[in-house]
Structures are given as structure tokens and as C-alpha cells.
Amino acid sequence: MPLEFRAGYNEERPAGAKGATDSLGTQRPELLAAALGSYDDEGPRILRRMAKRGLTALGLAAIALALGSCALSAGDAPRSAYGPYARLGPPDAPVRLYYKEEGKGSPLLLIHGFGASTYTWRHIAPELARDHLVIAVDLKGFGQSDKPFDERYSVFDQADLLAQLIVDKNLRNLTLVGHSFGGGVALLLALRADPRLKGRISKLVLLDTIAYPQNVPVFFRLLDVPVVSQLGFSMVPPEVQTRVALRIAYFDNSKIDPDEIETYAAPLKTAAGKHAIIHSARQIVPDGLSELSERYGSIKIPTLILWCDHDRIVPLGVGLKLRRTLPNSTFRLVEDCGHMPQEEQPQATLKLIQAFLGG
């Protein structure tokens, strides 16, 4: 049975999370090491191999992509093959966001993580749509959404666009479901003093969410160096970069599907896709996040905090701190899982979300 914590309970160690506490300062050693950039033996081994081949720059870039979330976004496709699109943003610089909509009932807005797309929800969205109107959106720069050559790819920029989407579609009694970077977008939307959003958002589901300032590994810092970032993308095939990223994001690498690698590698073959990845990564932990996180306690709506027990990207301690901070929150642990519960453990994730929504 998955472990449940509710806000206000005693500070206990969750079963199955040996050595873990709910303090960011005393989390499991392997998770803390991951947050600081020591990704057990997988990353260093790959980097050593690439260095021998003169491809260290690519290794750094590839692993940097994994750290943002999990996977890389589904590639560009002819727009006539997909739809619909929401035209958002200012009139002089509109952005078209692709979204998939299915089902009826109270709405759920699914917000993917850094580098992912609507594809990440493929295992759970159809079942959720049995009882809800499910809207899965591709954030700006990912999936089949526009990828303009600008720098507006922060969590704040993405939240601006989704706030407009919520209003334009007149969504009410809305549950936001956000994974990793997308969870940060969901938190920001819940905090906004935007009168247009007042009373619209009723619940939050946060999956392995970026929520607090954390140490950024050297791989991300290298993306700030134009020559290094461009060199990394050009020297090794996108499929190799994607495979490295997924092996860091998954706990059980045997669950990585070859089709998944091909799908997630596609955007790295386009200039626009590379631009979006680089500029999103540079803002993955935005300025002002510390001040923003001090306001989390003002979020009163029911919130499910769902975390993987082997997350090497956003440590378990982050989820436990969120549980203590959000006054109306429930914490659930997904066992034998890395950073992608909706992909690596979809059935367990689906059941936890359904139980929360039905409660």
C-alpha cells in the first residue's frame, strides 16, 4: 500500500524510503548527491566514455536535459495532422499552444514537465477522461506548440499563457495536474492574484515538482555557454542524448521503450526545438523562486503531493517540505519509481489521482 501523509501529522519516516526524513537537510544521501550533480555511477560512466571519444560537451548537454525533468518533447509534426490550438499571448507576439481534449465532467488541466509534452500522459489520460474533461497541453516550446526564437520560457511565462487558456476556455472547478517543471507552473497559477482566475482552481495535483531553489548541477550552467550548448547538440545523435536522459530519469531502465526514445528525440533534430530546450533549461530554477515559495502556505485548496521514492532529479525532501508547507495537502509515495510516475508507474499513479479526485 502506498504511504499517505496529511498535513499536520507527526514527522515520520515513510516506509520504503530508508534513511529519508522530511527535512531538506537530512534527505537520503543518494538523493542529496543527485541534487548536487553526482548521479550515482551512470552519468560519470557515460561522461568518461564520451570524453574518450572527444564528446564530453555532448555528454554534459545530454545529461543536463535529463535533469530538468524526464524526457524530451515529442517532435514537430505537420499542423494539419493535429489540433486544436489555442492562440495565446499578446497580439503582437501570439503563441499557439497545442492541446488534447477528451471526456466530460469537471476539468483537469495536465501540465507536463521540462522537455516533455502531452505524450507523457498517454498512460493515464484516457482513464481520467472517463469521469472528467481532460485537457493536456503542450507548453510553449514543446510538443506541437510554437517554439519561437525568444527567451520567454520561464515558469512565469508559461503560467501567463495557461492563465489565458483557462479564462478563454472558461474552465471552472478546475484541477491542475503538474509534473516537475509543470508542477511549478501549477503552483504559480494557484498563487496568482489574477482576478480572472478567482474561484476557478479547486484542486492541485503535484508530481515530483520543482518548488524550491536547489543546487543546479554543472551541466545546466554549461548550457549558459553558447558554444558548449550548441556543440553538445551537434556532436551526438539525438537518440543517444535521449537515451542518457531517460536512464537518469527512470528507476527501472528495462521499462524504457524504444518507441519512447524515438518520439522524445525528434525535437532535437530541429533548430527551434533545440532553442526551446536550451532557453527553458537556463530558467529551470527562476530568479525569485525563494520569495515565491514563502507564499506556498497561502494555498488552501486540497492538494495531492505525489512523489517517487527514487527521484534523482527533484529529491524526495522537496515533496516532504511541500507537504509540511501546504496546509490542506496529502502526500503519497510511489514505490520503485524515478522521476516520472505517470510513465514508469502509471497504474499506481492513476489510482492515487483517482482516489484524490473522488474524495
Q: Residue ranges of each PLM-predicted region?
A:
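Active-site loop/oxyanion-hole signature of alpha/beta-hydrolase fold enzymes
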Residues: 84, 90-93, 98-102, 136-181, ...
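Catalytic active-site module of serine/aspartate enzymes centered on a nucleophile-bearing elbow/loop
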Residues: 329-359
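Conserved HGGG/HGGXW glycine-rich cap/lid loop of the alpha/beta-hydrolase fold
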Residues: 101-144
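Conserved alpha/beta-hydrolase catalytic His-Asp/Glu region
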Residues: 220-221, 235-297
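Conserved hydrolase catalytic core segment
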Residues: 172-215
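Short alpha-helix in the alpha/beta-hydrolase fold that links the catalytic acid
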Residues: 260, 315-322
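Short beta-strand/loop motif that positions the catalytic acidic residue
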Residues: 299, 305-307
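Acidic catalytic loop of the alpha/beta-hydrolase fold
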Residues: 310-314
